[in-house]
Amino acid sequence: MPLSRLEILAILFGVAAGCATRFSIAGEPAAGQLHVGWATVDITPSARVVLDGSGYKRVTSEVEDPVTATVLALETRDGDRVIEQAIMISFDLVRMTKEVQDGLQLEAAKRLKDFDSSKLFCGATHTHCGPSISYERTGPGQLYDLSNETDVMTPQQYILLLYERVGAGIAEAWQSRKPAGMSWGLGHAAVGYNRRLSYTDGSAIMGFDTARPDFSHIEGSEDQAVEMLFFWDSGQKLTGLLLNIACPSQVGRKAISADFWHPIREGIKAKYGPQLHIFAQCAAAGDQCPEPIVRSRAEKAMTERRKISWKQELANRVVRAVDDVWPCAQADVQTRPVFAHRTIKMDIPNKNSYNEARWMPSMVPVEVHVLRLGDVAMATNPFELFLDYGIQIKGRSKAVLTFISQLTCDSQGYLPTRRAVAGGDYSAVNHTVGPTGGRVLVDESVKAINSMWP
Protein backbone atom coordinates (compact mmCIF):
# COMPACT_ATOMS: atom_id res chain seq x y z
CA MET A 1 0.00 0.00 0.00
CA PRO A 2 1.57 3.36 -0.99
CA LEU A 3 2.38 5.94 1.66
CA SER A 4 -0.08 8.77 2.16
CA ARG A 5 0.93 12.38 1.57
CA LEU A 6 0.99 12.99 5.32
CA GLU A 7 3.22 9.99 5.97
CA ILE A 8 5.69 11.23 3.36
CA LEU A 9 5.67 14.66 5.02
CA ALA A 10 6.27 13.10 8.43
CA ILE A 11 9.28 11.20 7.10
CA LEU A 12 10.70 14.23 5.30
CA PHE A 13 10.30 16.59 8.23
CA GLY A 14 11.31 13.96 10.80
CA VAL A 15 11.16 15.20 14.33
CA ALA A 16 10.34 18.74 13.25
CA ALA A 17 7.13 17.77 11.50
CA GLY A 18 6.27 14.55 13.25
CA CYS A 19 7.44 14.72 16.81
CA ALA A 20 8.97 17.11 19.28
CA THR A 21 10.93 14.87 21.63
CA ARG A 22 12.67 16.18 24.71
CA PHE A 23 15.24 14.02 26.47
CA SER A 24 18.97 13.90 26.93
CA ILE A 25 21.49 11.12 27.34
CA ALA A 26 24.98 11.81 28.63
CA GLY A 27 27.04 8.81 27.57
CA GLU A 28 26.31 5.14 28.15
CA PRO A 29 24.20 4.43 31.27
CA ALA A 30 26.09 3.28 34.34
CA ALA A 31 25.78 0.04 36.28
CA GLY A 32 25.15 0.06 40.01
CA GLN A 33 23.95 -2.02 42.93
CA LEU A 34 20.25 -2.70 42.40
CA HIS A 35 17.79 -1.93 45.21
CA VAL A 36 14.18 -3.14 44.95
CA GLY A 37 11.04 -2.55 47.00
CA TRP A 38 7.50 -3.84 46.55
CA ALA A 39 3.95 -3.23 47.70
CA THR A 40 0.66 -4.81 46.67
CA VAL A 41 -2.39 -2.72 47.48
CA ASP A 42 -6.02 -3.87 47.52
CA ILE A 43 -8.01 -1.29 45.54
CA THR A 44 -11.30 -3.17 45.67
CA PRO A 45 -14.10 -0.74 46.58
CA SER A 46 -16.48 -1.58 49.41
CA ALA A 47 -19.42 0.20 47.76
CA ARG A 48 -21.33 -0.12 44.51
CA VAL A 49 -19.35 1.23 41.55
CA VAL A 50 -19.77 1.53 37.81
CA LEU A 51 -17.53 -0.85 35.90
CA ASP A 52 -15.64 0.50 32.90
CA GLY A 53 -14.92 -1.21 29.60
CA SER A 54 -18.26 -2.13 28.02
CA GLY A 55 -20.74 -0.40 25.77
CA TYR A 56 -23.45 -0.51 28.43
CA LYS A 57 -23.76 0.50 32.09
CA ARG A 58 -22.85 -2.02 34.81
CA VAL A 59 -23.27 -0.94 38.43
CA THR A 60 -22.36 -3.52 41.04
CA SER A 61 -20.88 -4.24 44.45
CA GLU A 62 -20.34 -7.93 43.65
CA VAL A 63 -16.68 -8.95 43.85
CA GLU A 64 -15.58 -12.01 41.88
CA ASP A 65 -11.97 -11.47 42.92
CA PRO A 66 -10.01 -8.49 44.27
CA VAL A 67 -8.52 -5.76 42.10
CA THR A 68 -5.07 -4.59 43.11
CA ALA A 69 -2.33 -2.07 42.42
CA THR A 70 1.21 -3.45 42.45
CA VAL A 71 4.05 -1.02 43.15
CA LEU A 72 7.61 -1.81 42.06
CA ALA A 73 10.38 0.55 43.23
CA LEU A 74 13.78 0.35 41.52
CA GLU A 75 17.01 2.18 42.29
CA THR A 76 20.68 1.70 41.46
CA ARG A 77 23.48 3.15 43.56
CA ASP A 78 27.24 3.46 43.50
CA GLY A 79 27.96 3.44 47.21
CA ASP A 80 25.79 6.23 48.63
CA ARG A 81 25.38 7.95 45.26
CA VAL A 82 22.06 7.40 43.50
CA ILE A 83 22.46 6.52 39.82
CA GLU A 84 18.88 5.91 38.64
CA GLN A 85 15.33 5.52 39.97
CA ALA A 86 11.86 4.40 38.96
CA ILE A 87 8.55 3.61 40.58
CA MET A 88 6.14 1.74 38.35
CA ILE A 89 2.58 0.84 39.26
CA SER A 90 0.26 -1.70 37.65
CA PHE A 91 -3.49 -1.26 38.15
CA ASP A 92 -6.32 -3.74 37.60
CA LEU A 93 -8.26 -1.06 35.72
CA VAL A 94 -9.47 -0.65 32.15
CA ARG A 95 -7.43 2.50 31.59
CA MET A 96 -5.00 4.97 33.14
CA THR A 97 -5.55 8.73 33.09
CA LYS A 98 -3.10 11.59 33.25
CA GLU A 99 -5.08 12.97 36.19
CA VAL A 100 -4.59 9.83 38.28
CA GLN A 101 -0.90 9.55 37.41
CA ASP A 102 -0.34 13.24 38.18
CA GLY A 103 -2.13 12.80 41.50
CA LEU A 104 0.04 9.84 42.44
CA GLN A 105 3.18 11.72 41.46
CA LEU A 106 2.05 14.42 43.90
CA GLU A 107 1.52 11.75 46.56
CA ALA A 108 5.05 10.49 45.93
CA ALA A 109 6.47 14.02 46.15
CA LYS A 110 4.69 14.58 49.49
CA ARG A 111 5.73 11.27 51.02
CA LEU A 112 9.23 10.73 49.59
CA LYS A 113 11.99 13.32 49.80
CA ASP A 114 14.65 11.16 48.13
CA PHE A 115 12.70 10.22 44.98
CA ASP A 116 12.21 12.17 41.74
CA SER A 117 8.42 11.93 41.38
CA SER A 118 8.57 12.51 37.61
CA LYS A 119 10.03 8.99 37.42
CA LEU A 120 6.80 7.41 38.63
CA PHE A 121 4.48 5.98 35.98
CA CYS A 122 1.25 3.99 36.05
CA GLY A 123 -0.24 1.41 33.69
CA ALA A 124 -3.49 -0.53 33.42
CA THR A 125 -4.12 -4.20 32.65
CA HIS A 126 -7.29 -3.28 30.73
CA THR A 127 -9.62 -5.44 32.77
CA HIS A 128 -13.20 -4.78 31.68
CA CYS A 129 -14.40 -5.41 35.23
CA GLY A 130 -12.55 -2.72 37.16
CA PRO A 131 -14.07 0.38 38.78
CA SER A 132 -14.31 3.38 36.48
CA ILE A 133 -11.98 6.38 36.88
CA SER A 134 -13.62 8.17 33.92
CA TYR A 135 -16.04 10.53 35.62
CA GLU A 136 -16.67 12.45 32.39
CA ARG A 137 -18.61 9.39 31.17
CA THR A 138 -21.04 9.28 34.13
CA GLY A 139 -22.93 12.55 33.70
CA PRO A 140 -26.54 12.91 32.50
CA GLY A 141 -26.96 11.38 29.07
CA GLN A 142 -23.51 9.81 29.07
CA LEU A 143 -22.78 6.10 28.58
CA TYR A 144 -22.47 5.40 32.32
CA ASP A 145 -25.07 7.93 33.48
CA LEU A 146 -25.21 7.83 37.30
CA SER A 147 -27.58 10.76 37.78
CA ASN A 148 -30.45 8.50 38.87
CA GLU A 149 -28.33 6.05 40.87
CA THR A 150 -28.11 6.07 44.67
CA ASP A 151 -25.46 4.70 47.01
CA VAL A 152 -22.86 4.52 44.25
CA MET A 153 -19.20 5.40 44.69
CA THR A 154 -18.54 7.84 41.87
CA PRO A 155 -15.33 7.75 39.82
CA GLN A 156 -14.24 10.95 41.59
CA GLN A 157 -14.64 9.26 44.97
CA TYR A 158 -12.87 6.14 43.77
CA ILE A 159 -9.93 8.23 42.54
CA LEU A 160 -9.58 9.67 46.06
CA LEU A 161 -9.53 6.10 47.38
CA LEU A 162 -6.69 5.34 44.95
CA TYR A 163 -4.69 8.35 46.09
CA GLU A 164 -4.99 7.28 49.73
CA ARG A 165 -4.33 3.56 49.36
CA VAL A 166 -1.83 3.60 46.51
CA GLY A 167 -0.08 6.64 47.97
CA ALA A 168 0.61 4.56 51.07
CA GLY A 169 1.74 1.69 48.83
CA ILE A 170 4.20 3.97 47.04
CA ALA A 171 5.76 4.93 50.36
CA GLU A 172 5.84 1.30 51.50
CA ALA A 173 7.57 0.08 48.34
CA TRP A 174 10.13 2.89 48.30
CA GLN A 175 10.97 2.70 51.98
CA SER A 176 11.33 -1.10 51.87
CA ARG A 177 13.83 -1.21 49.01
CA LYS A 178 16.87 -3.36 49.73
CA PRO A 179 19.89 -4.69 47.82
CA ALA A 180 18.58 -7.07 45.21
CA GLY A 181 19.20 -8.92 41.98
CA MET A 182 17.25 -9.26 38.76
CA SER A 183 17.02 -11.69 35.87
CA TRP A 184 14.86 -11.95 32.80
CA GLY A 185 13.11 -14.86 31.16
CA LEU A 186 11.11 -15.60 28.03
CA GLY A 187 8.31 -18.16 27.95
CA HIS A 188 5.25 -18.76 25.82
CA ALA A 189 1.52 -19.16 26.42
CA ALA A 190 -1.45 -18.77 24.09
CA VAL A 191 -3.40 -15.98 25.79
CA GLY A 192 -4.01 -13.25 23.20
CA TYR A 193 -5.84 -13.77 19.91
CA ASN A 194 -6.24 -11.24 17.10
CA ARG A 195 -9.87 -10.14 17.13
CA ARG A 196 -10.17 -8.43 13.74
CA LEU A 197 -11.62 -10.50 10.89
CA SER A 198 -11.14 -9.65 7.22
CA TYR A 199 -13.58 -10.46 4.43
CA THR A 200 -13.21 -10.92 0.69
CA ASP A 201 -14.50 -7.43 -0.13
CA GLY A 202 -11.63 -5.86 1.87
CA SER A 203 -13.76 -4.92 4.87
CA ALA A 204 -13.01 -5.99 8.43
CA ILE A 205 -14.82 -6.23 11.75
CA MET A 206 -13.77 -6.54 15.35
CA GLY A 207 -15.73 -9.68 16.11
CA PHE A 208 -16.10 -13.44 15.94
CA ASP A 209 -18.11 -14.26 12.80
CA THR A 210 -15.93 -16.66 10.84
CA ALA A 211 -18.97 -18.60 9.58
CA ARG A 212 -19.75 -16.01 6.91
CA PRO A 213 -19.10 -17.36 3.40
CA ASP A 214 -17.01 -14.29 2.59
CA PHE A 215 -14.66 -14.74 5.58
CA SER A 216 -11.09 -14.42 4.31
CA HIS A 217 -8.54 -14.29 7.14
CA ILE A 218 -7.54 -12.93 10.53
CA GLU A 219 -6.37 -9.37 9.88
CA GLY A 220 -3.25 -9.23 12.06
CA SER A 221 -0.79 -11.34 13.97
CA GLU A 222 -0.59 -12.60 17.55
CA ASP A 223 2.25 -12.59 20.08
CA GLN A 224 2.23 -15.53 22.46
CA ALA A 225 5.39 -14.60 24.35
CA VAL A 226 5.32 -14.21 28.13
CA GLU A 227 8.13 -11.81 28.95
CA MET A 228 9.32 -11.95 32.54
CA LEU A 229 11.45 -9.98 34.97
CA PHE A 230 12.39 -11.77 38.20
CA PHE A 231 13.57 -9.88 41.29
CA TRP A 232 15.54 -11.58 44.06
CA ASP A 233 16.72 -10.52 47.51
CA SER A 234 20.36 -10.64 48.61
CA GLY A 235 19.94 -14.30 49.54
CA GLN A 236 18.63 -15.09 46.04
CA LYS A 237 15.09 -15.61 47.31
CA LEU A 238 12.44 -14.43 44.87
CA THR A 239 10.52 -11.34 46.00
CA GLY A 240 8.38 -10.79 42.92
CA LEU A 241 8.13 -10.92 39.19
CA LEU A 242 6.85 -8.81 36.34
CA LEU A 243 4.87 -10.58 33.62
CA ASN A 244 4.26 -8.94 30.25
CA ILE A 245 1.53 -10.42 28.02
CA ALA A 246 0.17 -9.03 24.75
CA CYS A 247 -3.48 -9.32 25.73
CA PRO A 248 -6.05 -7.25 27.62
CA SER A 249 -7.79 -8.99 30.52
CA GLN A 250 -11.42 -8.99 29.49
CA VAL A 251 -12.93 -12.42 30.02
CA GLY A 252 -15.23 -11.28 32.84
CA ARG A 253 -18.56 -9.55 32.38
CA LYS A 254 -20.54 -8.35 35.42
CA ALA A 255 -18.63 -8.45 38.73
CA ILE A 256 -15.55 -6.60 39.98
CA SER A 257 -12.58 -8.68 38.89
CA ALA A 258 -8.90 -8.57 37.96
CA ASP A 259 -9.85 -11.13 35.31
CA PHE A 260 -7.26 -13.75 34.33
CA TRP A 261 -4.55 -11.94 36.28
CA HIS A 262 -6.10 -13.10 39.58
CA PRO A 263 -5.70 -16.85 38.96
CA ILE A 264 -2.26 -16.16 37.47
CA ARG A 265 -1.20 -14.51 40.73
CA GLU A 266 -2.77 -17.19 42.87
CA GLY A 267 -1.24 -19.98 40.80
CA ILE A 268 2.28 -18.55 41.02
CA LYS A 269 1.98 -17.83 44.75
CA ALA A 270 0.71 -21.35 45.42
CA LYS A 271 3.90 -22.76 43.87
CA TYR A 272 6.56 -20.23 44.81
CA GLY A 273 5.36 -18.52 47.97
CA PRO A 274 2.42 -16.41 49.18
CA GLN A 275 4.71 -13.43 49.83
CA LEU A 276 5.43 -12.86 46.13
CA HIS A 277 4.38 -9.69 44.34
CA ILE A 278 3.12 -10.17 40.76
CA PHE A 279 3.33 -7.10 38.52
CA ALA A 280 0.92 -7.40 35.57
CA GLN A 281 1.82 -5.59 32.35
CA CYS A 282 -0.16 -5.47 29.12
CA ALA A 283 1.96 -5.24 25.96
CA ALA A 284 0.76 -3.77 22.64
CA ALA A 285 -2.64 -5.45 22.31
CA GLY A 286 -5.16 -3.04 20.80
CA ASP A 287 -6.28 -5.66 18.28
CA GLN A 288 -6.05 -8.63 20.67
CA CYS A 289 -8.52 -10.38 22.97
CA PRO A 290 -8.30 -13.39 25.31
CA GLU A 291 -10.95 -15.40 23.47
CA PRO A 292 -10.07 -17.66 20.52
CA ILE A 293 -11.69 -16.84 17.18
CA VAL A 294 -10.87 -20.10 15.41
CA ARG A 295 -11.46 -23.42 17.23
CA SER A 296 -13.57 -21.60 19.82
CA ARG A 297 -16.01 -24.51 20.22
CA ALA A 298 -13.17 -26.97 20.68
CA GLU A 299 -11.48 -24.70 23.25
CA LYS A 300 -14.76 -24.42 25.16
CA ALA A 301 -15.22 -28.19 25.10
CA MET A 302 -11.71 -28.74 26.45
CA THR A 303 -12.28 -26.40 29.41
CA GLU A 304 -15.55 -28.20 30.15
CA ARG A 305 -13.71 -31.52 30.15
CA ARG A 306 -11.13 -30.08 32.52
CA LYS A 307 -13.93 -28.59 34.67
CA ILE A 308 -12.31 -25.15 34.80
CA SER A 309 -13.24 -21.65 33.63
CA TRP A 310 -11.68 -20.05 30.57
CA LYS A 311 -9.77 -17.50 32.64
CA GLN A 312 -8.40 -20.37 34.75
CA GLU A 313 -7.30 -22.10 31.55
CA LEU A 314 -5.43 -18.96 30.46
CA ALA A 315 -3.86 -18.65 33.91
CA ASN A 316 -2.72 -22.29 33.84
CA ARG A 317 -0.93 -21.64 30.55
CA VAL A 318 0.92 -18.65 31.99
CA VAL A 319 1.87 -20.49 35.19
CA ARG A 320 3.30 -23.34 33.09
CA ALA A 321 5.37 -20.78 31.18
CA VAL A 322 6.74 -19.43 34.48
CA ASP A 323 7.53 -22.97 35.62
CA ASP A 324 9.48 -23.57 32.42
CA VAL A 325 11.52 -20.37 32.68
CA TRP A 326 12.13 -20.39 36.44
CA PRO A 327 15.34 -22.49 36.51
CA CYS A 328 16.91 -20.39 33.73
CA ALA A 329 16.08 -17.13 35.51
CA GLN A 330 17.37 -18.40 38.84
CA ALA A 331 20.71 -19.30 37.25
CA ASP A 332 21.42 -15.83 35.83
CA VAL A 333 20.84 -13.20 38.53
CA GLN A 334 22.49 -9.78 38.15
CA THR A 335 22.99 -7.53 41.17
CA ARG A 336 24.71 -4.63 39.37
CA PRO A 337 22.80 -4.13 36.13
CA VAL A 338 22.94 -1.09 33.90
CA PHE A 339 19.81 0.94 34.71
CA ALA A 340 18.61 3.98 32.80
CA HIS A 341 15.21 5.70 32.82
CA ARG A 342 14.16 8.47 30.45
CA THR A 343 10.89 10.41 30.41
CA ILE A 344 10.08 11.60 26.90
CA LYS A 345 7.49 14.19 25.90
CA MET A 346 6.32 13.57 22.34
CA ASP A 347 4.01 15.56 20.12
CA ILE A 348 2.44 13.00 17.79
CA PRO A 349 0.35 13.81 14.69
CA ASN A 350 -3.33 13.10 15.13
CA LYS A 351 -5.36 11.25 12.51
CA ASN A 352 -6.67 14.50 10.96
CA SER A 353 -3.39 16.33 11.28
CA TYR A 354 -2.95 17.67 7.76
CA ASN A 355 -3.47 21.43 7.97
CA GLU A 356 -4.17 23.03 4.58
CA ALA A 357 -3.12 26.49 5.75
CA ARG A 358 0.21 25.64 7.32
CA TRP A 359 1.16 22.33 5.72
CA MET A 360 2.02 21.15 9.23
CA PRO A 361 0.37 18.48 11.38
CA SER A 362 -1.54 19.25 14.56
CA MET A 363 -0.25 17.30 17.52
CA VAL A 364 -1.31 15.10 20.43
CA PRO A 365 1.01 15.44 23.47
CA VAL A 366 2.17 12.06 24.74
CA GLU A 367 4.37 11.00 27.66
CA VAL A 368 6.55 7.93 27.17
CA HIS A 369 8.92 6.25 29.62
CA VAL A 370 11.85 4.26 28.29
CA LEU A 371 14.01 2.10 30.57
CA ARG A 372 17.04 -0.09 30.28
CA LEU A 373 17.58 -2.71 32.98
CA GLY A 374 20.52 -4.93 32.14
CA ASP A 375 19.88 -6.57 28.76
CA VAL A 376 16.21 -5.58 28.83
CA ALA A 377 14.43 -2.49 27.51
CA MET A 378 10.96 -1.22 28.34
CA ALA A 379 8.94 1.38 26.43
CA THR A 380 5.54 2.68 27.48
CA ASN A 381 2.75 4.30 25.50
CA PRO A 382 -0.73 5.62 26.37
CA PHE A 383 -2.63 3.83 23.57
CA GLU A 384 -4.51 0.63 22.96
CA LEU A 385 -1.65 -0.01 20.60
CA PHE A 386 -2.15 -2.45 17.75
CA LEU A 387 0.26 -5.36 17.99
CA ASP A 388 2.17 -4.55 14.79
CA TYR A 389 3.62 -1.40 16.37
CA GLY A 390 4.89 -3.33 19.37
CA ILE A 391 6.49 -5.91 17.08
CA GLN A 392 8.17 -3.11 15.11
CA ILE A 393 9.71 -1.66 18.28
CA LYS A 394 10.84 -5.08 19.50
CA GLY A 395 12.32 -6.00 16.13
CA ARG A 396 14.34 -2.78 15.82
CA SER A 397 15.47 -2.60 19.46
CA LYS A 398 19.11 -3.24 20.41
CA ALA A 399 17.97 -4.86 23.65
CA VAL A 400 18.03 -8.64 23.97
CA LEU A 401 14.41 -8.47 25.14
CA THR A 402 12.05 -5.48 24.86
CA PHE A 403 8.91 -5.00 26.94
CA ILE A 404 6.06 -2.79 25.68
CA SER A 405 3.60 -1.37 28.21
CA GLN A 406 0.42 0.08 26.72
CA LEU A 407 -2.22 2.25 28.44
CA THR A 408 0.51 3.79 30.56
CA CYS A 409 0.62 7.42 31.80
CA ASP A 410 -2.73 8.15 30.12
CA SER A 411 -5.36 6.66 27.83
CA GLN A 412 -5.42 8.01 24.28
CA GLY A 413 -7.59 5.30 22.73
CA TYR A 414 -6.84 2.91 19.91
CA LEU A 415 -3.85 3.35 17.62
CA PRO A 416 -4.69 1.20 14.58
CA THR A 417 -2.53 0.11 11.67
CA ARG A 418 -2.98 1.25 8.07
CA ARG A 419 -4.50 -2.10 7.10
CA ALA A 420 -6.98 -1.84 9.99
CA VAL A 421 -8.03 1.67 8.95
CA ALA A 422 -8.53 0.40 5.40
CA GLY A 423 -10.72 -2.43 6.71
CA GLY A 424 -12.77 -0.16 8.97
CA ASP A 425 -15.09 -0.97 11.91
CA TYR A 426 -14.72 -0.37 15.64
CA SER A 427 -11.15 0.10 16.91
CA ALA A 428 -10.02 1.24 13.45
CA VAL A 429 -12.28 4.28 13.05
CA ASN A 430 -12.71 5.61 16.62
CA HIS A 431 -9.20 6.86 17.33
CA THR A 432 -7.30 10.11 17.85
CA VAL A 433 -3.92 9.05 16.48
CA GLY A 434 -3.61 7.01 13.30
CA PRO A 435 -0.91 5.19 11.33
CA THR A 436 1.20 8.31 10.73
CA GLY A 437 1.37 8.91 14.46
CA GLY A 438 2.08 5.23 14.97
CA ARG A 439 5.11 5.52 12.73
CA VAL A 440 6.38 8.45 14.81
CA LEU A 441 5.77 6.61 18.10
CA VAL A 442 7.72 3.60 16.87
CA ASP A 443 10.61 5.64 15.46
CA GLU A 444 11.03 7.77 18.58
CA SER A 445 10.67 4.82 20.97
CA VAL A 446 13.32 2.88 19.05
CA LYS A 447 15.63 5.90 18.98
CA ALA A 448 15.33 6.31 22.75
CA ILE A 449 15.88 2.61 23.43
CA ASN A 450 18.87 2.28 21.13
CA SER A 451 20.53 5.39 22.56
CA MET A 452 20.94 3.42 25.80
CA TRP A 453 23.16 0.84 24.08
CA PRO A 454 26.56 1.39 22.47
Annotated model-derived regions:
Residues 4, 21, 194-195:
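Short, intrinsically disordered low-complexity segments
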Residues 5-8, 393:
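N-terminal export leaders
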Residues 7-22:
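Bacterial N-terminal signal peptides
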Residues 27-277, 281-284, 288-302, 306-313, ...:
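Conserved beta-alpha junction segments in alpha/beta enzyme cores
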